[in-house]
Each structure stands twice: as C-alpha cells, then as structure tokens.
C-alpha cells in the first residue's frame, strides 16, 4: 500500500490590496507547478491532477481566483494583467524559482499573460483546452457556458449546456453542476474582453505544452496546429482523447501523465525534488 494522498494546506498571500488563497501540496522544496482553473471555477477542479503531480514529487500550488474561497480583491475595472499579477505574487512568495504554469481554459490566458509580464517567474506554460484564437468564443458557446453556471435553470437545461460546451460524447457532465461562481465568471469574462488577445497570445518566449482535447467546441485541433506552425519548436502538442473543454475532469490521468512527462523534460534528472 502506498502512502495516503497528502491533503493540501491553505495559506493566504497578499498582493497589495488583494488577498489570494493558495492550496499547496507536495514536496516543499520540489520544483513548482502552478495550476490555474477555468472561467468561473475554482482550484478544486484540479484535485485529481494536483494529487498526481504531488505524488510525482512536485510542489503544486493552486491559487484561488479573486472571489473564490478566501481570495479577495477588486473584480471591476481589472484585466488579465491583474489576474497574472496575483499569480506572480504566489510564485514569488514560494521562492523556489520559476514555475511551470498550467492554465485550463480561461486560466490559459492568465498563464500566457504571466509569461509575458513576468518571464523571470515562468519556466514554461501548459495550455489546457485553450481557445487560442484572437476572437472571442462564438455567441452560442458563450451562452452555453452561462447556462452551465446558471442555477436558476433546470438540471436538464444545464446538463445539455454542459454536454455541448464542456464534455465529450459518452462523458457524464453532472459532476460540473456544482463548483460554479457566476459573479467571478462575469468578472473574468469582462477582464478577458478588456485585454487584447494580441497581448497574451505568444506567452512571451516561454516553452509551451499544448494539451488539446479531441472533442472541444471552444478549442479546436486546427488552432493548436496553427499555433505550433507559428511558434515552431517552442510548442509541444499532446492530444487528449475522449475529452472536451472539461478535460481535466474527463481525463485526469492523461492530463497528469502529460504534465509530468513535460516537467521531467524541463527539469532533467529530477523527480520534482
């Protein structure tokens, strides 16, 4: 029998007038992997992935976005630079050197902005189910995301929206009926719209792992291919089968394996320690 999974500790980090709750687990002196969640959702979405990364010897940090858990800060009049600054404060506070920053869906834009604004804090980024295009998602997709988070709708309506926007055929979306923060979702969407997609598009000069679901209505395989063509050797693409936009919930083993494999390339001859 292996050791039981380590429960994360919870700390609050100050970033000027902002307070960011951080879930931390794994080797305290291990190489740092930071996990950033999707639009309107929190750090718990990464529970299964974080456990696997910590078990591989890495120090795993999960900052809660503003408005979730104990994280507090302005939600109006901000943009992606502000969200990236929150994550920068977390990495700097940890003091273990540049981190491998993993962004799921909306979190991928925050990861790319952080790599642009603070390259000294970013060893590499992973873009997970990334809508990498320079235009916003189509109206039907945006509406499905709103419906997924809208507790005033019937369960059947929300399941239909979740299945369309987030889950591949055959994958049960009902686990994502919970975990939504509509006010945070709206604030993050406005912040994203206030930020030109040109600003974060290239992720600075960081190496990029691109985890591409094979059934994603928001993040298309063709977009991943075009992104690699533009940035060449900086980009490594891994397609995650039988998954859609909620890939970290649908295929946590495959996502974790890809992240661990890439981390071992970033830090050769180490297992996180």
Region annotations inferred by a language model:
Residues 55, 62-102:
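Active-site loop/oxyanion-hole signature of alpha/beta-hydrolase fold enzymes
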Residues 15-25:
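A short loop-to-beta-strand scaffold at the N-terminal edge of the catalytic core in hydrolase folds
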Residues 234-273:
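Catalytic active-site module of serine/aspartate enzymes centered on a nucleophile-bearing elbow/loop
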Residues 23-70:
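Conserved HGGG/HGGXW glycine-rich cap/lid loop of the alpha/beta-hydrolase fold
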Residues 208-243:
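Conserved loop-alpha-helix segment in the C-terminal half of the alpha/beta-hydrolase fold
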């Amino acid at each position: 029998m292996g050791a039981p999974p380590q429960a994360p500790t919870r700390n609050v980090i100050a970033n000027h007038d902002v307070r960011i709750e951080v879930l931390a687990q794994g080797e305290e002196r291990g190489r740092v992997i930071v996990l950033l969640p999707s639009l309107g959702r929190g750090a718990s979405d990464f529970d299964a992935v974080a456990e696997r990364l910590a078990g591989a010897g890495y120090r795993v940090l999960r900052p809660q976005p503003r408005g979730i858990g104990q994280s507090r800060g302005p939600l109006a009049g901000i943009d992606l630079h502000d969200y990236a600054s929150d994550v920068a404060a977390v990495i700097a506070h940890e003091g273990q050197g540049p981190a491998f920053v993993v962004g799921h869906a909306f979190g991928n834009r925050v990861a790319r902005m952080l790599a642009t604004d603070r390259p000294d804090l970013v060893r590499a980024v992973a873009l997970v189910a990334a809508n990498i295009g320079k235009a916003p998602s189509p109206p039907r997709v945006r509406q499905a995301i709103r419906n997924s988070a809208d507790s005033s709708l019937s369960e059947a309506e929300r399941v239909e929206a979740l299945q369309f926007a987030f889950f591949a055929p055959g994958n049960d979306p009902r686990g994502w009926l919970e975990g939504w923060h509509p006010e945070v979702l709206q604030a993050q969407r406005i912040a994203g719209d206030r930020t030109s997609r040109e600003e974060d598009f290239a992720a600075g000069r960081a190496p990029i792992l691109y985890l591409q679901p094979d059934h994603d209505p928001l993040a298309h395989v063709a977009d991943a291919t075009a992104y690699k063509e533009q940035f060449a050797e900086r980009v490594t693409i891994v397609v995650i089968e039988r998954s859609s936009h909620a890939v970290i919930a649908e295929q946590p083993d495959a996502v974790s394996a890809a992240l661990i494999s890439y981390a071992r390339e970033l830090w050769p001859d180490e297992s996180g320690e």
